[in-house]
């Protein structure tokens, strides 16, 4: 369906977990191996870092070939891991309306500033 829309983007939103250690935290953006997806992911990663956690050193990264949707989409696509549910502090933060709003605003800002606006 998304591919039938001109100039479409796909943003898949997730929460991360890592059961081996609870210390991992921070948003991270992944992309399929396509230049436009990589550029969007890098831009979104930087906006999330600036807006949510300037100390976050995570970089946008290529997805391993294990996410069906991302392997079969032809438009630019990113997968956003908003934080780690396995980290108690981040889990608590992710559950608050204020942080969810801040996260949504950062993602919207990243998308709107990356995509050229249609001429009126």
Can you say where each PLM-predicted feature lies in the sequence?
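Active-site-proximal helix/loop segments of hydrolytic enzymes
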Residues: 1-120
């Amino acid at each position: 369906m998304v591919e039938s829309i001109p100039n479409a983007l796909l943003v898949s939103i997730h929460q991360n977990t890592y059961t081996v250690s609870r210390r991992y935290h921070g948003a991270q953006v992944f992309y399929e191996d396509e230049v436009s997806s990589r550029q969007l992911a890098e831009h979104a990663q930087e906006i999330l870092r600036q807006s949510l956690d300037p100390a976050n050193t995570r970089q946008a990264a290529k997805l391993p070939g294990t996410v069906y949707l991302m392997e079969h989409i032809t438009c630019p696509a990113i997968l956003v891991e908003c934080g780690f549910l396995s980290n108690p502090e981040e889990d608590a933060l992710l559950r608050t309306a204020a942080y969810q709003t801040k996260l949504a605003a950062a993602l919207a800002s990243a998308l709107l500033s990356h995509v050229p606006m249609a001429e009126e």
